[in-house]
Amino acid sequence: MKLVLARIDDRLIHGQVTVGWGRKLRPQHIVLASDEVAADAWQSRVYAMTVPPEVKVMVLTVDEAASVLQRPADHGLAGRRVLVLTGTAGDMNRLVESGAPVTAVNVGGMHFARGKRELLPDVYMDRDDLEALRTLGGRGVAVTVQSVPG
């Protein structure tokens, strides 16, 4: 497995991911790690339908995603280009904490919500988000902010 991007984006799969990052990185699989989305069959199907037909989507809980990423050959990902998405910094931190082989994280859209403050355009965080990113950095994970590829 080649992990082409691990991204935090509260919109999960959308145009910037499928068109912007997808065209540049050409993922063959997207692993969407979200306990909330994985528990909702309708949301899972909708996200899976929003990608080009040649891209396979796996909607998993954070723990399931960590397990899959630790043993990619057991899940049909050997030799495949994989993009990982979480909706929150906390979920990405849990993914890494659970053993997912993530060495770099891209922060995409983290939009306004009550209690969050703007750090950059389209990037709003609260203390929990900042702490999760600090923890990732402390684990040696490189953290960058970039909406679309340059």
Where are these regions (language model features)?
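Long, hydrophobic N-terminal alpha-helical segment
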Residues: 1-51
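Structural motif
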Residues: 2-6, 28-31, 55-58, 80-84, ...
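Ordered, amphipathic secondary-structure segments that act as subunit-interaction surfaces
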Residues: 58-108
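Glycine-rich, aromatic-bearing surface loops/beta-hairpins
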Residues: 89, 98, 103-150
